[in-house]
């Protein structure tokens, strides 16, 4: 497998302060005070003790990121040793898991006459710009997968936080889903669609991913603040269980301020996936009852992100890592990132 890298901004940028619904950049305390102290005061962080508490949370998050590679590897090893799956079959993708309409679209995309206009006749277009809906899995598979995820959640095996904003969920590569499930799903069934729908933003050359499930519950995470993804294209599939409300809402692309954006709500439907551009700003409204599990696949195109990191908006400075990491690669001429450093652990 080709070597993948992380951008060094992972250790400084897009740190989410849940209490203030704010993403920040932290290089030093002096820089942070200069850039954010007045903003935080306007959001209710008025005292020095409150500010010091914010600094402490940021430093803890940076430490978590610095140790992420090591801790993830350790968790995966322990899970492999001590965890016994409930449904072993869900770890290996089979066409019988997939909805007929997805298989029909993939078949169409493989035909010589395939084009965007033809695919748009087979896929549902949402009111939000270039957001598409289609049934991904059969209900029986979603039921089995949810039972497996809940079985793992209730086990003594270690669990990692799925991302910097969700507190509850599962990182799927640590559980062993990447090679036999997520990778073939991306390569064989999703990339034919994204190649037509998102060719302008890397959809035709997706070569890595990060996949995780997130959980929303009345006693845990209820919603998700407005954000963009570390992906070129994202698939968000509602797996279940029983829930009310909690719709997604989409704004504009990340370059457009929220004040200039009109948001559009998009409903979650079990077994169905929503496909959208990673830089398309979005969030999740609060559920009002029940529990909802979502499968999220951040699909990445090194050819696209090697030019500009989607998280910091600059040419990436690479940090060595494991697996698919954040989807950056070294160009064949070595030019993509002359600055390559070892991960801080």
Swiss-Prot record:
Q: Name the top EC class.
A: oxidoreductase
Cofactor entry: Fe(2+); L-ascorbate
Q: Which residues bind 2-oxoglutarate?
A: 292
Q: Which residues bind Fe cation?
A: 227, 229, 282
- Details of cofactor binding: Binds 1 Fe(2+) ion per subunit.
What are the UniProt keywords, alphabetically? Answer: Dioxygenase, Iron, Metal-binding, Oxidoreductase, Vitamin C
Residues of the Fe2OG dioxygenase domain: 207-301
Sample GO molecular function, one term? dioxygenase activity
Protein EC: 1.14.11.-
- Entries under Pfam families matching the protein: OGFOD2-like
- What family, per the record? Belongs to the OGFOD2 family.
Q: Per its record, how is this protein called by name?
A: 2-oxoglutarate and iron-dependent oxygenase domain-containing protein 2
What organism does the record attribute this protein to?
A: Danio rerio (Zebrafish)
Annotated gene: ogfod2
């Amino acid at each position: 497998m080709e070597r993948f890298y992380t951008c060094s901004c992972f250790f400084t940028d897009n740190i989410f302060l849940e209490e203030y619904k704010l993403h920040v950049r932290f290089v030093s305390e002096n820089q942070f005070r200069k850039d954010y102290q007045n903003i935080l005061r306007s959001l209710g962080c008025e005292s020095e003790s409150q500010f010091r508490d914010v600094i402490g949370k940021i430093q803890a998050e940076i430490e978590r990121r610095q140790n992420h590679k090591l801790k993830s590897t350790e968790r995966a090893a322990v899970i492999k040793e001590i965890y016994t799956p409930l449904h072993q079959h869900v770890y290996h993708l089979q066409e019988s898991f997939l909805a007929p309409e997805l298989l029909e679209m993939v078949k169409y995309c493989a035909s010589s006459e395939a084009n965007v206009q033809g695919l748009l006749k087979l896929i549902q277009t949402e009111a939000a710009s270039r957001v598409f809906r289609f049934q991904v899995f059969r209900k029986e598979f979603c039921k089995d997968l949810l039972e497996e995820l809940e079985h793992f959640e209730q086990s003594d095996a270690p669990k990692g936080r799925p991302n910097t904003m969700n507190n509850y969920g599962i990182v799927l590569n640590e559980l062993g889903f990447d090679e036999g499930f997520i990778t073939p799903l991306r390569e064989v069934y999703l990339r034919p669609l994204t190649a037509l729908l998102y060719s302008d933003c890397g959809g035709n050359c997706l070569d890595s991913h990060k996949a995780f499930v997130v959980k929303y519950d009345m006693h845990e995470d209820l919603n998700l603040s407005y954000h963009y993804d570390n992906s070129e294209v994202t698939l968000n599939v509602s797996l279940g269980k029983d829930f009310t409300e909690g719709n997604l809402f989409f704004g504009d692309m990340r370059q457009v301020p929220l004040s200039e954006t009109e948001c559009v709500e998009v409903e979650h439907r079990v077994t169905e996936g929503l496909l959208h551009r990673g830089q398309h700003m979005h969030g999740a409204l609060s559920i009002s009852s029940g529990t909802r599990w979502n499968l999220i696949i951040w699909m990445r195109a090194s050819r696209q992100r090697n030019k500009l990191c989607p998280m910091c908006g600059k040419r990436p400075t690479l940090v060595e890592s494991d697996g698919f990491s954040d989807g950056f690669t070294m160009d064949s001429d070595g030019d993509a990132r002359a600055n390559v450093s070892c991960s801080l652990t």
